[in-house]
């Protein structure tokens, strides 16, 4: 299957500048292509993954991805999809974010491919251009009329847009031109909101290098959930690739909780499973939706891809322990992951009677209620029912001297962190 055919089967193509020309090009040779990300934060979230998963598919097909980190454009701010100006970041913050995103990209792309990935930072060539060169060599090739007509600018004319953000499309066009002349990059991939920026780059290349230049643009559709909301958010906010921001367990849970109506679409977008395997899973969603096999496969594939085999196995173990109630099998680190979003309480390591301890923490409203719940078998500590109101809570009850898990009823878990 041609790489373009595969992208279209996966529903991953929104717009192309010249479909026939691009098809012919990728059939004739292995091309270089690029996609960029600005370092507005120190981690990507799963929404950022969408165009880069397409880059990965090109890599697996033997093409040559160039990943651009916007060390220069990140100091300016992309107006795409924004209703207001971005807050400018210091150069120190931008550099910190550049380093973090570079590490994430290398982890995702430096394995499993049939070709190497090149990482570039547009600060390296942009900072050498002075204002006179910018205006004479590049600005002269942009019509104010055409710039104003771009959706990313037109949508901001009523609320206002600074000259800084207005010129962003010129800077991105300069990136494409630089990569075309220095790295033989012929294709730029981006989200649907990048169409205007991408076509600006194509126009600049043809003006500077001649209309015979073979350059192309391709955008990815905006991914919406079946309920019409934007993909990439959980109840707790964005789902990050950084395990310190979103633990591998939380990451796994996001995917395993995918709606039946969305799971096949996500399998096509985000995994490298074959059409035959995805069709097989689609049948199982229709026939045996209660087994949630497609969701489990999606969660496994994505957790392995972003966090690795070990993190996936750990997330699966935590999930099984929470489902069965057998939390004693977990380590303290696994407890911290699995119970991160649970109600959390602080306690000293001092030995206390269970009734007083539950009331002092606020898990129980009164001693009478605490005793009643214990006598009714409604209180469990670290997976074991507490049957005696005279039980003492000691540091020996904890996971590695750090945590105690209380369950009240069938599903109400609380995480107790032990201090000094």
Curated annotation (Swiss-Prot):
Chain residues that bind ATP: 233
InterPro entries named in the record: aa-tRNA-synth_I_CS (IPR001412), aa-tRNA-synth_Ic (IPR002305), Rossmann-like_a/b/a_fold (IPR014729), S4_RNA-bd (IPR002942), S4_RNA-bd_sf (IPR036986), SYY-like_C (IPR054608), Tyr-tRNA-ligase (IPR002307), Tyr-tRNA-ligase_bac-type (IPR024088)
Gene Ontology CC annotations of this record: cytosol
An MF annotation (GO) of this entry: tyrosine-tRNA ligase activity
Record motif 'KMSKS' region, residues: 230-234
Enzyme Commission code(s) on record: 6.1.1.1
Broad EC category: ligase
Cell location: Cytoplasm
Pfam entry (one): SYY_C-terminal
Keywords: Aminoacyl-tRNA synthetase, ATP-binding, Cytoplasm, Ligase, Nucleotide-binding, Protein biosynthesis, RNA-binding
GO BP terms: tRNA aminoacylation; tyrosyl-tRNA aminoacylation
Motif 'HIGH' region per record, residues: 39-48
Main location per the UniProt record: cytoplasm
Residue intervals of the S4 RNA-binding domain: 352-418
Catalytic activity reported: tRNA(Tyr) + L-tyrosine + ATP = L-tyrosyl-tRNA(Tyr) + AMP + diphosphate + H(+)
Annotated residues for binding of L-tyrosine: 34, 168, 172
Family: Belongs to the class-I aminoacyl-tRNA synthetase family. TyrS type 1 subfamily.
Its job: Catalyzes the attachment of tyrosine to tRNA(Tyr) in a two-step reaction: tyrosine is first activated by ATP to form Tyr-AMP and then transferred to the acceptor end of tRNA(Tyr).
Subunit-level organization: Homodimer.
Protein name: Tyrosine--tRNA ligase 2
Gene that produces this protein: tyrS2
